[in-house]
């Protein structure tokens, strides 16, 4: 009896899998244009917002710290350069002398500032000149964009050789010139080849050859 349990026997053959067909470009295009479900991000929206807020807070703290450091450096520089004035117990003449000294210091600082500004302006001008020279050198060695231009052989030779182009292009100058009269004379001499053969045939023709 045959086994009815659904199992395959020794004589049964397993069907071969269908051949894999390559998708056409149209199918690929259709697949690409079809809307697909977007992959879910591993980070939720609330978590992203929290991280952005934290980054902004850290950046704000860094900016505040840098501003505080600049203010501290400015205060230290002013304390070393501008010492506090001691005005207690000074008379009118002493105050005038102190004012004159302060004015002299201000004038000296202005002169130094003017000298520094002149040096900075000179350096900026020199840098601009050097940059201009660099651009000029780049422009000299820059390869221009070439365009296709239709030009005849005569025009090309004229551009390359100049006045000598006419001599080189005159190809007929070295050829042998044959006059029209010479060709007509040769044609008359040839004439009808049958008559020449008849004239030279027979005894008379042989006689003419010996006589000639």
UniProtKB/Swiss-Prot annotation:
The gene is TNNI3. Residues 131-151 are annotated as: Involved in binding TNC and actin. It comes from Bos taurus. One of its GO terms (molecular function) is magnesium ion binding. One of its GO terms (cellular component) is troponin complex. Residues 34-81 are annotated as: Involved in binding TNC. GO terms for biological process: cardiac muscle contraction; skeletal muscle contraction. Residues 1-11 have a biased composition (Polar residues). The lineage of its organism: Eukaryota, Metazoa, Chordata, Craniata, Vertebrata. Belongs to the troponin I family. This is Troponin I, cardiac muscle. Phosphorylated at Ser-24 and Ser-25 by PRKD1; phosphorylation reduces myofilament calcium sensitivity. Phosphorylated preferentially at Thr-33. Phosphorylation by STK4/MST1 alters its binding affinity to TNNC1 (cardiac Tn-C) and TNNT2 (cardiac Tn-T). Phosphorylated at Ser-44 and Ser-46 by PRKCE; phosphorylation increases myocardium contractile dysfunction. InterPro entries: Troponin (IPR001978), Troponin-I_N (IPR021666), Troponin_I (IPR050875), Troponin_sf (IPR038077). It holds the Pfam family Troponin-I_N. The modification Phosphotyrosine is found at residue 28. Interacts with TRIM63. Binds to actin and tropomyosin. Interacts with STK4/MST1. The modification Phosphoserine is found at residues 5, 24-25, 44, 46, 79, 152, 201. The modification Phosphothreonine is found at residues 33, 53, 80, 145, 183. Keywords: Acetylation, Actin-binding, Muscle protein, Phosphoprotein. Residues 1-45 are annotated as: Disordered. The record marks 82, 99 as: Involved in TNI-TNT interactions.
């Amino acid at each position: 009896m045959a086994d009815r349990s659904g199992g395959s026997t020794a004589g049964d053959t397993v069907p071969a899998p269908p051949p894999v067909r390559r998708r056409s470009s149209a199918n690929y295009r259709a697949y690409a244009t079809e809307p697909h479900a977007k992959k879910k991000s591993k980070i939720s929206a609330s978590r992203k917002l929290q991280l952005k807020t934290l980054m902004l807070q850290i950046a704000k703290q860094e900016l505040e710290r840098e501003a505080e450091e600049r203010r501290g450096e400015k205060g230290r520089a002013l304390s070393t350069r501008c010492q506090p004035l001691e005005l207690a117990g000074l008379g009118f003449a002493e105050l005038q002398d102190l004012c004159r000294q302060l004015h002299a210091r201000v004038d000296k600082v202005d002169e130094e500032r003017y000298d520094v500004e002149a040096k900075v302006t000179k350096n900026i001008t020199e840098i601009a000149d050097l940059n201009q020279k660099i651009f000029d050198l780049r422009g000299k060695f820059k390869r221009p964009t070439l365009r296709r231009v239709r030009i005849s052989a005569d025009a090309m030779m004229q551009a390359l050789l100049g006045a000598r182009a006419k001599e080189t292009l005159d190809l007929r100058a070295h050829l042998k010139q044959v006059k029209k009269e010479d060709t007509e004379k040769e044609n008359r001499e040839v004439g009808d080849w049958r008559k020449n053969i008849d004239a030279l045939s027979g005894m008379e023709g042989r006689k003419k050859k010996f006589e000639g």
